[in-house]
Amino acid sequence: MFIDTAKIFVKSGKGGDGSISFRREKYIAFGGPDGGDGGKGGNVVLVVDPNMTTLLDFTYKRKYKAEPGGNGAGSKCFGKNGKDLHIKVPMGTIVKDAETDKIMADLSKPEDSYVVAKGGRGGKGNCRFTTPTRQAPDFAEPGMPEEERWIKLELKLLADVGLIGFPNVGKSTLLSVVSKARPKIANYHFTTLKPNLGVVSIEGVNNFVIADIPGIIEGASEGVGLGLDFLRHVERTRVLIHVIDISSVEGRDPYDDFLKINDELKRYSVKLYDRPQIIAANKSDMLFDEEKFEEFKTKVEKHGYNKVFKISAATKQGVDDLMKEAARLLSTIPVTDLEISEEDRFIEEEKRFTYSIRKEDNTYIVEGSFVDRLLNAVNVNDPDDLRYFHKVLKNKGVMEELMEMGIEDGDVVRLNDFEFDFLL
């Protein structure tokens, strides 16, 4: 089975909490704080595996979670870092955020990897908060929360040349002749239900990868037939070989087929439509009127397609010349990465350390993940903790933003269940 799309849930590891601890040893008075930091949570990392060819594995397992960081401990013992979780994906995998449908990564090289969910940073232990005026802090930071999201994986074949054309025009036969690939071949439409790859090796030219893409029909750009499943794989190729049944044994007009396929390419992507295209007039061994080929060639050339080859995949007539021309064209076209527009690119939002302020009557309400994290770290009933609390609010710009909003002495500031009067 060929699976080329998948949707999975990923969750990184939470950062370990910092420790609140004081040194307690016989004969050592006032040992001081010795709480260690929490460990970092594990990342979820997508890693290219060149041996994988489909996304089939993700139909059986859809949820992936990395290891959390260990909590800090006394004696300045740091928590253990959580292990990263590596998820193998095939080359040519596009990673998208499921919520926004924006592209996060294009994993198209053997060494490619991408951190799709970052582990939370470990919280600082209380030994980190000592100052000349705060000798015994009894607070520590909690670990940063984990990241979690649903992501979509789309596999796009990494082939140099794509064979396109209506069903049953001989694409699979051509692939089997020019490579060692053995696709299913039969005399009915949509025999090929998944893309097949083969390596073309001809003396005197560089080897290249060719893909037999499932047949396209009218309306494919709107999802008809194999539709978008077909077109997704054509995007990666640098050269297209447009296979036409010149014999018309099924009653179709070759020129009409040529126009319809190119119209679908153009509807789907202008860049795809403009890609170099070689026309392969196949099944010429069944053509009994040579004028029909010349007439077809003349019409096609008027559209700017000057590379028209009369071939027979069944008898191998003209096939070598066709492949040599494909190799020549490839040598003139550099390999480029998938272009991702700014509109389509996923922008990571920092959700783990944010806040917002709104005003209700004379009360200013500060809320968000920043507030939750700060209040979890301090004891608001302790004077030392409160001094640290106000220092953090000032350093993070909360006080400045409150003043810009017009706060006055005596106005109430609320952070979750904790309230205090604002004083300049």
From Swiss-Prot:
InterPro entries: G_OBG (IPR031167), GTP-bd (IPR006073), GTP-bd_Obg/CgtA (IPR014100), GTP-bd_prot_GTP1/OBG_C_sf (IPR036346), GTP1-OBG_CS (IPR006074), GTP1_OBG_dom (IPR006169), GTP1_OBG_dom_sf (IPR036726), OBG_GTPase (IPR045086). Pfam families: DUF1967 (PF09269), GTP1_OBG (PF01018), MMR_HSR1 (PF01926). The gene is obg. Keywords: Cytoplasm, GTP-binding, Hydrolase, Magnesium, Metal-binding, Nucleotide-binding. It comes from Clostridium botulinum (strain Langeland / NCTC 10281 / Type F). Its cofactor is Mg(2+). This is GTPase Obg. The keyword Ribosomal protein does not apply. The keyword Nucleotide-binding applies.
